[in-house]
Regions:
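Conserved nucleotide-cofactor-binding alpha/beta core module
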Residues: 102, 107-138, 146, 150
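C-terminal/domain-terminus segments
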Residues: 249-270, 440, 528-531, 540-573
């Protein structure tokens, strides 16, 4: 018997009297189901497998898909997985995504509108629910089935809005409804991973005119909206999978559902932008390594009090250029080597400028190999700042004054400070506990010797290996702008309004890591140094672009060291902690 795409398939045949049958025929015409039936018959779709049916439907409508095959392949092949998408069309995206995602997850199930029962060939994909009555007790078994499927290690695709996207008169955009809290509940399932999806596109203008007249009436036109996607190119963007450990399960279901929604919007193609290409040909070869014996002799010649820390085979020192010119040259060479790995660097044989002549260089040496493994460049503001004839501060000797406009209220013009910058660790120490610890143990020892420095300030470079979306999220999550300082060259990439709205309601800071994982293809997390400053209770003031550092975004921050957690002060100040903390704040 020929299968019918008809409202009659949703109503028991025993209940279909003459009047109901007339209503079914009228409804089929009104809803476009009659046209679908013609499509069904002409293309001989009855009895096909779910895969064959999906392929033939897309062929019949001449719908072409645009998606990143590598992103599809990055979807986990096993284990509990939640996939969630926006719902721009109200129908065809369910068929498309079910077909596409089942290629990598044959165990995929899709939580779908009961209206899709008319496509009997696709029923094997679906777990049906009624989005028009989300609180209906009849939905409970399907929701229980979906949760059970995921708990058993299955993959589940949901459209948590439950309704097709609508035109928002305030933002003048087609937007998603709020996502059902079931999405948040599923993110709490132990071990579950989450892959956000965004389908670009919208329905016809007529569809949105109808919803302005009567919001519910638009549902009657979804069949026509499926048919009018004929000859369309549909773009699908699949985000990178968020692992369970980066999901903040302490948040409520509503917040987690809103997070999943914002992560879907983070994939929207029209809100992406690439960094300008760096001309690799413009980079000069690195300078030759300074001989170890030369470095050793200069280091041994430093005054004893400039030897700050001894730890295992490592030593930490500070020096000025006139004391150790070759050490500073080697630091500049290593800086350039490391910065180039992060799509930064000057392009010269060494990363150096005239500030190397007047700033303080704190560095770590491996005594066994006689190699430098890391360094910081520190500006002692009380040594650097001078007064102009008009009594104002001369900021020309402050490196970051090239990047930021410092008002009189900013700390570097109020008290002695250390400007921290140009930090690096050589590649073999970048993931080592010892590298970062020794740099900061050295900073702690320096502050112990010079306790007038209560505030540290500087920038954390946000490498252009990060996506612009990630940088914008970090800025929105951390920066609290004030009149005391502003960037001379602002980072002008606009954050997606739906992510911004999420941040205003729930906050972004606790969700930064989850956002970055779904954006960064290699799974990059918050930079280690930035995490370190966050643990020190840093204040974040502005995000600027450093024109002298390959146009790299720099996040300006400050740390009031006496207010840092006691555990960290003990770690870095060690025996000098008590004397440092009792040093009077008023002593300048």
């Amino acid at each position: 018997m020929q299968k019918q795409i008809s409202l009659g398939e949703l109503i028991s045949h025993e209940k279909q009297n003459g009047l109901i049958k007339l209503g079914i025929r009228l409804g089929d015409r009104l809803l476009g189901l009659r046209k679908m039936q013609e499509l069904y018959e002409i293309n001989e779709m009855q009895g096909l497998s779910k895969e064959e049916f999906s392929d033939r439907l897309l062929d019949a409508l001449n719908i072409s898909l645009e998606f990143d095959e590598e992103a599809l392949e990055r979807i986990p092949k096993t284990g509990p997985l939640l996939l969630a998408s926006n719902h721009p069309f109200g129908g065809i995206e369910g068929v498309i995504l079910a077909r596409l995602l089942s290629q990598v997850r044959p165990d995929l199930k899709v939580l779908a509108n009961t209206a899709l029962r008319v496509f009997a060939e696709l029923n094997e994909y679906f777990i049906f629910t009624n989005p028009l009555a989300p609180k209906n007790a009849k939905n409970a078994p399907s929701l229980k089935q979906t949760i059970g499927h995921v708990k058993k290690g299955g993959a589940l695709l949901i459209f948590p809005a439950g309704k097709v996207s609508f035109f928002d008169s305030k933002s003048k955009r087609v937007v998603e409804h709020e996502w059902n809290r079931i999405a948040g509940r599923m993110l709490r399932i132990p071990g579950v991973q989450y892959s956000p999806i965004f389908v670009s596109g919208k329905n016809s203008d007529w569809f949105y005119r109808v919803e302005r007249i009567n919001f519910k009436m638009r549902m009657f036109f979804l069949g026509w909206e499926l048919l009018n996607k004929k000859n369309h190119n549909l773009r699908i963007d699949i985000g990178n999978t968020v692992t369970a450990k980066r999901i903040d399960v302490e948040a409520g279901d509503i917040e987690l559902a809103a997070l999943a929604r914002a992560q879907s919007y983070a994939q929207e193609a029209s809100w992406r932008s690439s960094w300008p290409e760096t001309d690799a040909k413009a980079f000069s070869p690195l300078a030759e390594t300074i001989e170890k014996a030369v470095l050793h002799n200069e280091i041994q010649s430093l005054p004893k009090e400039q030897h700050l820390v001894e730890y295992r085979q490592f030593s930490v020192y500070y020096a000025y250029r006139e004391q150790a010119p070759n050490v500073v040259l080697e630091i500049a060479r290593l800086r350039e080597l490391v910065f180039r790995e992060h799509n930064e660097g000057s392009g010269e044989e060494r990363d150096t400028d005239h500030f190397d002549d007047i700033y303080t260089h704190l560095f770590v040496v491996n005594n066994e190999t006689q190699e430098l493994i890391g360094a910081y460049r520190m500006g002692q503001s009380d040594r650097l700042l001078a007064k102009l004839d008009n009594g104002d501060d001369d900021l020309s000797s402050i490196y970051l004054a090239q990047m930021f406009n410092f008002g009189k209220q900013f700390i570097n013009r109020q008290e002695p400070c250390l400007e921290m910058g140009r930090s690096f660790l050589t590649p073999e120490y970048q993931r080592s506990f010892h590298g970062l610890y020794l740099l900061w143990r050295g900073i702690g020892a320096f502050c112990g010797k010079f306790p007038q420095y209560r505030h540290l300030y500087g920038t954390v470079s946000l490498s252009k290996l990060f996506d612009k979306r990630s940088v914008a999220i970090i800025k929105a999550a951390l920066v609290k702008e004030t009149e005391a300082v502003s960037p001379k060259n602002d980072f002008d990439f606009a954050l997606h309004p739906e992510i911004k709205s999420f941040g205003e309601e729930f906050g972004l800071r606790q969700h930064m890591s989850a956002f970055l994982q779904t954006i960064e293809e290699d799974g990059k997390d918050i930079p280690i140094l930035l995490k370190h400053y966050m643990k020190l209770n840093a204040t974040f003031h502005a995000l600027g672009v450093d024109k002298n550092f390959a146009d790299t975004p720099g996040l300006l921050l400050s740390v009031h060291l006496p207010s840092a957690p006691e555990k960290m002060l003990k770690k870095y100040l060690a025996e000098e902690m008590t004397s440092y903390l009792t040093y009077p704040e008023t002593a300048k």
